[in-house]
Amino acid sequence: MKIGVIRFPGTNCDRDVAKAIELAGLTPEYVWWSEENLTDFDGIVIPGGFSYGDYLRAGAMASITPVIDGIKELVKEEKPVLGICNVAQILGEIGLVPGIFITNENPKFNCEWVDLKVSTNRTPFTKAFKNNQIIALPIAHAEGRFYTEDIDLLKDQDQIVLQFEGKNPNGSMEAITSVCDESGLVCAMMPHPERACEELFGSDDGLNFFKGFL
């Protein structure tokens, strides 16, 4: 299976993501922001970083690039899309997932390992976990605080994927740090699963997110 790895100017986790995809037994292929046709891919991962330097606001400029049309077409074909960190903000900008990710309650860059509760395992990326299972992944963001005006709808439609467990390091509403669309095939997450794919680095919980494409 071939998984596209989207690159924007300022993306800095693309190689980590490509390695994680290989560890999951899949074939990664880099795709530039200028590409529109993604139909050859079985799924897409959009790595984090600082797309276009996060000028204006995080994800704003990336949200109007040509590759976004290709991603939307892939969603129509019901192929899985995983957006990590900065891209969670982009997916919110273009309306593929609910809510927005805004500046942390403590407006500083926050980089640490966190415990997370798997709030739903109905997505391809969390299907290997049990509901309410606790996993460990790192976070690294300054604009990762989740907010929505439709929190009850998200709960009713089972669109909350991950929540901080034990502490809420950025002040996110309901400690939410990952959400999905109604189908569960499009997932936006602030934590970095690609940095937790080998026990050597402290946890391999992140590998299951990439095995979800299988």
Regions from the language model: what does each represent?
Residues 1-84, 92-98, 103-110, 117, ...:
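N-terminal beta1-alpha1 cap of cysteine-dependent amidohydrolase-like domains
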Residues 49-50, 87, 142, 193:
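Active-site metal-binding loops of divalent metal-dependent hydrolases
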Residues 41, 73, 104-214:
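Amide-donor transfer/coupling interface in amidating biosynthetic enzymes
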